[in-house]
Structures are given as structure tokens and as C-alpha cells.
């Protein structure tokens, strides 16, 4: 049996009523058959306020009766050195050895 100390107290809701939005599923036409497919359009300044600025990548999780949209954090820009290493990794083994030899000479390790 549950003791009074293990019962969670009610807390404030995670989503306040002022943050709720009500939408209607509309439709879009699918060319060339012009069949109706369900569509939901989201727009408004509230999107930016919620962290969904223009150009933000969004993860979409779909469950029965529930869609969860999550803004992805922007990826940090890759340094010029890392971009160069990525290019070198695509070279042939012989060319990679030449690049490694050059790096060794510049670093004074050989």
C-alpha cells in the first residue's frame, strides 16, 4: 500500500493554458491525382518565441493521436582544420601518407 510520504504533490502544469494552440487538420492536394492529403500549417510569432526561428531544423516524433515537435540545437561550425581533415580522409591511402609525411615535417617529429 502507498504511504502518504510517497504520494507526489500536484505541481504546476508544464504547459500553461496561454501557451496552448488550437488547430484544424486541413488538406493539401497531391498532384497529379489531386487526392486530398491531411495537412497541418503552423505559423505565427509564437513559434519564434518557442525557439523555432526561421531555418531551425525540427525533429518530429509521431505517436497515435500525438505529434511532438522539437527544435534541434544548431551544430557548431566545423573549424577549417577539421574540414581539411575530412577532405584528406577521402583521399587514397598513398595521398594520405603524403599528407601525414608533410604534417610530420611541419611538426618536426621526424
Curated annotation (Swiss-Prot):
One of its GO terms (molecular function) is RNA binding. Its main location: cytoplasm. The keyword Nuclease applies. Its EC number is 3.1.-.-. One of its GO terms (biological process) is RNA metabolic process. Residues 29-74 form the SpoVT-AbrB domain. It is found in: Cytoplasm. Keywords: Cytoplasm, DNA-binding, Endonuclease, Hydrolase, Nuclease, RNA-binding. GO terms for cellular component: cytoplasm. InterPro entries: SpoVT-AbrB_dom (IPR007159), Toxin_SymE-like (IPR014944), TypeI_TA_SymE (IPR020883). Belongs to the SymE family. Involved in the degradation and recycling of damaged RNA. It is itself a target for degradation by the ATP-dependent protease Lon. This is Endoribonuclease SymE. It comes from Salmonella choleraesuis (strain SC-B67). The gene is symE.
